[in-house]
Amino acid sequence: HMVDAMRAYTHEIMNKLHVILGLLQIGEPEKAQAYIMDTTRTQREAVSRIMHQIREPSVAALLVGKTSRAAELGISLTLDRESALSADSAWLSPDAYVTVLGNLIENAIEALNQSRRVDKSISVSIREGADSLLLCVEDTGPGIPAGMRRKLFQRGTSTKGAGRGTGLSVVREVVDAYRGQIRVESEQGVG
C-alpha cells in the first residue's frame, strides 16, 4: 500500500513538473516560481495535517497517496478535522486499517471518476474512542441502488463488471474478524 501511495504521489509530482516546464517554456518564470511556492505550500499543509491527526504511519501514508490519486482525477479527498488515530491503536492492526480504508476510498474514487458530477468529493473520518472506533468514507457519487446495497459485501458483487467485486467482501471479512459492524447509507444521485 505504501508503494501505491508513492506511485500516486510520483505521478502527481510529474504533472506539476510539466506545468512548471510549460510556464518556463512560454517565458513566464515569475508564474512558474509562484506556482512552485503555492504547490509546495499546499502539499506540505495537507501532508502535515494528515500526519498530525493520523499517527499510524501506514494509514497516514495511505491517506496521502489516496489524496494524491484523487486529486489527479479532479476529486477532492479530505480528512475530517476531528479525525484522530494514535500510533498504537489497539482497535485494528495497521494492515486491517489499510485494507478497510483503502478499499472504501478506492471504491469512492472509482465511483466518482465514472460520475458526470461536477462536485466530486470524498470525506474520510476516523474517530478512535475509549470504547469504539468509527471509520467513515462519504462521497458525492451517483449512489448505490437499493437492490445492490443488500449484496454489496458478497464476493463477486460489483457494478464495474466481471472479475471485480472482491474489495468490499474483504472489508466485510476484516470487520467480522474484529467483531465490528459495517453499514452503508446511500441515496441515488446523492452519494
Q: Language-model features: where?
A:
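Detector for a conserved hydrophobic position within an alpha-helical segment of the HATPase_c
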Residues: 175-176
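Short alpha-helical Gxxx[C/S/T] motif in the catalytic ATP-binding
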Residues: 167, 171
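A short beta-strand-to-loop motif within the catalytic HATPase_c
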Residues: 184-188
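Acidic ATP/Mg2+-coordinating residue in the GHKL
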Residues: 139
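Conserved short strand/loop->alpha-helix "switch" segment adjacent to the catalytic nucleotide/phosphoryl-transfer site
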Residues: 51, 77-100
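Short conserved segment of the HATPase_c
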Residues: 144-155
